[in-house]
Regions:
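Short beta-strand-to-loop acidic/aromatic patch adjacent to the donor-nucleotide binding site
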Residues: 125-140
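Active-site beta-to-alpha loop of glycosyltransferases that engages the nucleotide-sugar donor
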Residues: 50-63, 84
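Short, acidic, metal-binding catalytic loop of nucleotide-sugar glycosyltransferases
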Residues: 64-75
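Cell-envelope/extracellular polymer assembly enzymes that use nucleotide-activated donors
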Residues: 44-47, 77
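Acidic helix N-cap motif at the loop->helix transition within catalytic regions
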Residues: 60, 87-94, 102, 144
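N-terminal membrane-anchoring/stem segments of glycan-assembly enzymes
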Residues: 1-42
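A conserved acidic beta->alpha catalytic loop
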Residues: 82-90, 105-107, 140
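Conserved donor NDP-sugar-binding/catalytic core segment of glycosyltransferases
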Residues: 143-162
Length: 162
């Protein structure tokens, strides 16, 4: 009986060991591989869209954070959609330096409608952007974020999630 059990378990263990060694070797090789990261000159323009509903407590900090990024100011604009707000979200965002667009629509409610509405408005503007960046009002962004997005766009990537 033990012989039959050994006949089944030993080949299974050999297969498991082979897979384990294979992935271990891949991990070791991956640790030594040098990754070449090219830093491109900032040239892509971004439309930053922030959708906010009654976010006066946090939207100002986000806009200030976005204004302080390590990226040329003339290559991005910040658009805040104050969606059906009953507080001072629009005033706070505007005071922090954002282009604020207030939207009041009781039938088409929610972030999806607000963002679609804002995308339509931005696309009709005279200035054209290379990419949209989308944030919630309670986000904060690393100072190098837009440089990273620029690098990914320069490599030819069309959709980036960061």
């Amino acid at each position: 009986m033990n012989y039959l059990l050994d006949l089944i378990l030993i080949p299974m263990q050999v297969i498991i060991v082979i897979y384990t060694v294979y992935y271990f070797v891949l991990a070791v090789i991956g640790m030594w591989r040098s990754r070449v990261h090219k830093n491109y000159t900032p040239k892509n323009s971004f439309a930053i869209v922030v959708c906010a509903h009654n976010e006066e407590a946090v939207v100002g900090e986000l806009v200030k954070n976005l204004r302080s990024l390590d990226y040329p100011d003339d290559l991005y604009d910040i658009f805040v959609v104050a969606d059906n707000c009953t507080d001072k979200t629009a005033e706070v965002a505007s005071a922090a330096g954002a282009n604020v667009h207030e939207r009041f629509n009781k039938e088409e409610v929610g972030k999806g409608y607000a963002m679609g509405w804002m995308f339509d408005r931005v696309e009709k503007m005279d200035r054209k952007y290379d990419a949209f960046l989308i944030f919630d009002a309670d986000n904060l962004v690393h100072p190098q974020f837009m440089l990273e997005m620029n690098d990914h766009l320069e490599k030819g990537e069309s959709v980036i999630q960061g």
